[in-house]
Amino acid sequence: EPTQSLLLFGLERLREAGLGSLPGGGAEIFDDRVHDEAYQNNVGEAGWFDVHRTAHEIGMFTNATMLYGHVERPEERITHMLKLRAHQDASLASRKASFNCFIPLSFIPEGSELSQAAGPTGLMDLKTLAISRLMLDNIPHIKAFWIMQSAKLAQVALNFGCDDMDG
């Protein structure tokens, strides 16, 4: 398939130039309703997984993200994590690399096209991080992104399943 060949070619060139891993942004929520409502201009689930599957096949580790607290429902967050878990299982079984880290990202409504959204609460942040650790036990690291959650909440998140902080 031409698109897959171009993707493989591009990732191999980037790796040869020194790129060691991919950050994993752009996943948003793996749900057609959410994608159509809020992220029509983004790559979408199939494209996102194509990039990561190809990277894993050539030995490049990646991270995975989930942007939550906007228009998605709790069950759509769970489905997102289940899809990541299934992909990670496949990567661990048959590829040279896999996801190294999962980073749940709190949606910040201010200044966005979804500014009417309430955004996540601190409790939602902690629940999401804890559920992530339980559901994604096949991904080595769960990261609290303190820029979006505050430094104090990220510190608490270290007791809710996170083993890393960034920001």
Residue ranges and their predicted role:
Residues 164-167:
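Glycine-rich phosphate-binding active-site loops on the catalytic face of alpha/beta enzymes
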Residues 30-32:
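Glycine/Thr-rich phosphate-binding loops of Rossmann-like dinucleotide-binding domains
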Residues 1-5, 34-45, 114-119:
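Glycine-rich tight-turn/loop motif centered on a GG-T
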Residues 10-27, 46-113, 122-152, 156-159:
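Conserved C-terminal portion of the radical SAM core fold
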